[in-house]
From Swiss-Prot:
Top-rank taxon: Bacteria
Protein's name according to its UniProt entry: Large ribosomal subunit protein uL3
Record GO terms (molecular function): rRNA binding; structural constituent of ribosome
InterPro entries for the chain: Ribosomal_uL3, Ribosomal_uL3_bac/org-type, Ribosomal_uL3_CS, Transl_B-barrel_sf
Length: 218
């Protein structure tokens, strides 16, 4: 299945494998999502499927979005995402996308917004080494030189300096699904994913899952 699913990060936990080793996992409440729009190459120039996630009260949604969802006969949904497909006619408008569409052991790419850290300094943002902390030192957490005077006489673009940290879209690739709970719409994936508990996640089948290398002769 080429479609992804939207979900909410619940937090992290751990599972134990057959050897008794603790494996860090992330719990994701994924779906159910509804197909809200089908796009085709004839009408839109490309084939895609749009899905919606998370019910929302009528007072919290604008009229254009309300009318868009009414065309597909869906309830009011907060989040909409679109996925490119080869043939959108294979899907049905209003159909549900659930965790049943994924398999245990499948690799997925998970996208989300990282936790915002606000305005951060050189050590926290870039991992710079600090200066001496002893008495008499005037350089504790300063960045050091940011450029020469006469030549070039300016700060080069891209120079790592203090500034806003976090709050960016990040994708963690090829995470393995270790467990699926269909009763509670849960995906349990190995490792960590971007964002804090409660943040929106986009889970898609992995684009790159690695290449197996044949050992020995043919």
């Amino acid at each position: 299945m080429s479609l992804g699913i939207l979900g909410k990060k619940l937090g992290m936990s751990q599972l134990f494998d057959d050897q008794g080793r603790a494996v860090p996992v992330t719990l994701i409440e994924a779906g159910p999502c509804r197909i809200t729009q089908l796009k085709s190459a004839d009408t839109d120039g490309y084939a895609a499927v749009q899905i919606g996630f998370q019910l929302i009260r009528e007072k919290l949604i604008n009229k254009p979005s309300k009318g868009h969802l009414a065309k597909s006969g869906n309830d009011l949904l907060r989040h909409l995402r679109e996925y490119r497909v080869e043939n959108s006619s294979e899907f049905e408008l209003g159909a549900s996308i659930t965790v049943d569409d994924f398999e245990k052991g499948q690799k997925v790419d998970v996208s989300g917004d990282t936790m915002g850290r606000g305005f951060a300094g050189y050590q926290k943002r870039h991992g710079f080494s600090r200066g001496p902390m002893s008495h008499g030192s005037k350089n504790h957490r300063l960045p050091g030189s940011i450029g020469a005077g006469t030549t070039p006489g300016r700060v080069y673009p891209g120079k790592r300096m203090a500034g806003r940290m976090g709050g960016k879209k990040v994708t963690t690739r090829a995470l393995e699904i270790l467990k699926i709970d269909t009763n509670h719409n849960l995906l349990v994936v190995k490792g960590s994913v971007p964002g804090k508990p409660g943040s929106l996640l986009n889970i898609r089948p992995a684009k790159r899952v690695g290449v197996s290398i044949q050992q020995g002769g043919e």
